[in-house]
Amino acid sequence: MTGKNWILISTTTPKSLEDEIVGRLLKILFVIFVDLISIIYVVITS
């Protein structure tokens, strides 16, 4: 199994397709949020 597929597959089985879509969106938003925080931190500390 490749890394990309591992990221897309959630640890729990989604009850419906909508739950799966929401879960993926939340993961994407969380990654973007962490990236923004790290960028802001670098800008402030530089």
From Swiss-Prot:
One cellular component (GO) term of this entry: sarcoplasmic reticulum membrane
Organism for this UniProt entry: Homo sapiens (Human)
Keywords: Membrane, Sarcoplasmic reticulum, Transmembrane, Transmembrane helix
The protein's name in its UniProt record: Myoregulin
Assembly and interaction partners: Homooligomer. Monomer. Interacts with ATP2A1/SERCA1. Interacts as a monomer with ATP2A2/SERCA2; the interaction inhibits ATP2A2 activity.
Membrane topology: Single-pass membrane protein
InterPro entries with a match to the protein in the record: Myoregulin
Domain of life: Eukaryota
Ranges annotated as spanning the membrane: 22-42
CDD domains documented for this protein: Myoregulin (cd20260)
Single GO MF annotation: enzyme inhibitor activity
